[in-house]
Amino acid sequence: MHGLLLAAGLISLPLHVLAHPQPSSTSLAGRAVDLNEYRIGHRSSYTSNDEMMKQPSIASFRAGTYVEVATEMVKQTMPNMEFRLVDDHYIGQSGIGHVRFRQTMHGIDIDNSDFNVNIGQDGKVLSHGNSFYTGPAPESSPVQKRDFSDPMQALHGVRKALNLPIKAEGATVENMSEHKVMFKGTSGALSDPTAKLCYMAKEDGSLALTWRVETDIGDNWLLSYMDAKDTGKVHNVVDYVAHATFQVYKWGLADPTEGNREILTNPWNLQTSPLTWLADGQNNFTATRGNNAIAQYNPDGGNDYENNYRPSPKNLKFEYPYSANMDPPKTYIDASVTQLFYTSNVCHDLYYMLGFNEKAGNFQVNNRGQGGKGNDYVILNAQDGSGTNNANFATPPDGQPGRMRAYIWTRANPPRDASFEAGTIIHEYTHGLSNRLCGGPANSRCLNAIESGGMGEGWGDFYATAVRLKPKDTRKTNYVKGGWVNNSPKGVRMYPYSTDMSVNPLVYTSNNQLNEVHAIGTVWATMLYELLWNLIDKHGKNDGPVPIFKNGIPSDGKYLAMKIVMDGMAIQPCNPNFVQARDAILDADKNLTKASNKCEIWKAFAKRGLGVGAKFDPKNRIGSNEVPKECK
């Protein structure tokens, strides 16, 4: 019998390198460069299903396959526009076809101009999102005129502008494909930097030709859009890092204060991990490695992980001693790696059941012919030496491994290990979920605007909080985030998650005073906590570790909330705002349950100021407590 010995904890951190559980500025580690200055602005629109019904010629359009319907819809909606089909379309678990297009100009991508079309189960257009550029086009191709700088100048430009620890003296340029090169012979990055020629649509309505320089330096995995003529000018920056028997803290325990470790035998779900957690279809492993994840000790914080230490008991008994009083942390590294491996694999299995499968871009080496791109398990680094008091997750596009770094927290004596706070690990893994779903598996750049980035943090907190609910909890139950690992009863957020406005007063217009993604994420997660309890009060709460489905719909309110929030991620446009994400959740429920929860959803958002009349303006959001007349 195989078994796993694990421990689960609860903390919330970013995931793309997404990190920093407490409100702080988003900066390059140790380099005093504020990446918020270079965030991509909000340009997308979202046409909900209700709005689609007002356009009957499009709403009723059918032209063949779901991809053909979507393609023809874009042609009709955006005539004379040049675009290409992105190769990551799929039909999700809820029956919605997701098709995405990238706008091009003279054969060159406009990297932040996307059109996503959602096709309902009836073969008609359900909704769509659009951030296509509609301004003046360059008269001729810059490639024909060679109207751009050498890509090496762009690499030097980003090194200087962002103070990156990359040395490129003597480096050479190798062609990878049309408009894309790789820099060989550099040092300081974890992989060879690359540069791709592309356009960027600016908030002022102009179009900039840029070199998109990709540099992975560990705590930051950057896409820097450098002006193709003035290579010292940075237009935008995207960071992919947002910021057997197992003896573990069982799933549902937020941290070591909520229970004791148990020995679990074969804890995997064969429906979602048919190869188990310790095999990939080619090899059977006796260490913390398998199809979904590979976990190891990483004390130096480096990128090499294959040969790092990981527990490998000959009898597959991953049973190791741990207590919160043990010190130093390396004395319990076996328990730490095991717990991290366990929690991440359970995340994989639960999210798979809710719709984050191979076609949707999940993290697996072997996709077993089920769609998507493989060879992308999650690299899990326990007690990572590259930082403290944090955790982060890097989410490159489908087909490239995700990377989670769990750090030691020094705010208690002895220090505490993030691997044992399940909330932190669930939060980080959820960054991988949201970045793969929003924008599609091939595009991990769709949660980079300040409000969409905030929702990325909020989703992490929401799923971590939903998982930790206890049988006796009610809507009066409050939860803090990251309390144990931070050694603070207040946790790492501004307020506890609560449906009591006197405990947590956050509303939509609170965002007008906030400019940091974790703070904005707390507002979003607060709204989702209201939604969670509205649905639990209506449908009840399944306290088991997996959902029970009836006709493809979770039968209880907790898992139903997790399901429609996840479906909404895939429906919404690239870089959505709160209003668009709310509408996407409403459309997800309409598709899944025929809008049977419409009023519960509206009342949750309206209570926190995101009602019918709410309007997005990055400088002056307008709140509303109104619900549709049929919900009054």
Swiss-Prot record:
<dbReference type="InterPro" id="IPR050371">
    <property type="entry name" value="Fungal_virulence_M36"/>
</dbReference>
<keyword id="KW-0964">Secreted</keyword>
<comment type="similarity">
    <text>Belongs to the peptidase M36 family.</text>
</comment>
<keyword id="KW-0865">Zymogen</keyword>
<keyword id="KW-0732">Signal</keyword>
<feature type="signal peptide">
    <location>
        <begin position="1"/>
        <end position="19"/>
    </location>
</feature>
<feature type="active site">
    <location>
        <position position="431"/>
    </location>
</feature>
<dbReference type="InterPro" id="IPR027268">
    <property type="entry name" value="Peptidase_M4/M1_CTD_sf"/>
</dbReference>
<keyword id="KW-0479">Metal-binding</keyword>
<keyword id="KW-0325">Glycoprotein</keyword>
<keyword id="KW-0378">Hydrolase</keyword>
<dbReference type="Pfam" id="PF07504">
    <property type="entry name" value="FTP"/>
</dbReference>
<keyword id="KW-0645">Protease</keyword>
<dbReference type="GO" id="GO:0006508">
    <property type="term" value="P:proteolysis"/>
</dbReference>
<dbReference type="InterPro" id="IPR011096">
    <property type="entry name" value="FTP_domain"/>
</dbReference>
<dbReference type="InterPro" id="IPR001842">
    <property type="entry name" value="Peptidase_M36"/>
</dbReference>
<keyword id="KW-0862">Zinc</keyword>
<feature type="binding site">
    <location>
        <position position="430"/>
    </location>
    <ligand>
        <name>Zn(2+)</name>
    </ligand>
</feature>
<keyword id="KW-0482">Metalloprotease</keyword>
<dbReference type="Pfam" id="PF02128">
    <property type="entry name" value="Peptidase_M36"/>
</dbReference>
<dbReference type="GO" id="GO:0008270">
    <property type="term" value="F:zinc ion binding"/>
</dbReference>
<feature type="propeptide">
    <location>
        <begin position="20"/>
        <end position="246"/>
    </location>
</feature>
<comment type="function">
    <text>Secreted metalloproteinase probably acting as a virulence factor.</text>
</comment>
<dbReference type="GO" id="GO:0005576">
    <property type="term" value="C:extracellular region"/>
</dbReference>
<feature type="glycosylation site" description="N-linked (GlcNAc...) asparagine">
    <location>
        <position position="591"/>
    </location>
</feature>
<feature type="glycosylation site" description="N-linked (GlcNAc...) asparagine">
    <location>
        <position position="284"/>
    </location>
</feature>
<dbReference type="GO" id="GO:0004222">
    <property type="term" value="F:metalloendopeptidase activity"/>
</dbReference>
<protein>
    <recommendedName>
        <fullName>Extracellular metalloproteinase 1</fullName>
        <ecNumber>3.4.24.-</ecNumber>
    </recommendedName>
</protein>
<keyword id="KW-0843">Virulence</keyword>
<feature type="binding site">
    <location>
        <position position="434"/>
    </location>
    <ligand>
        <name>Zn(2+)</name>
    </ligand>
</feature>
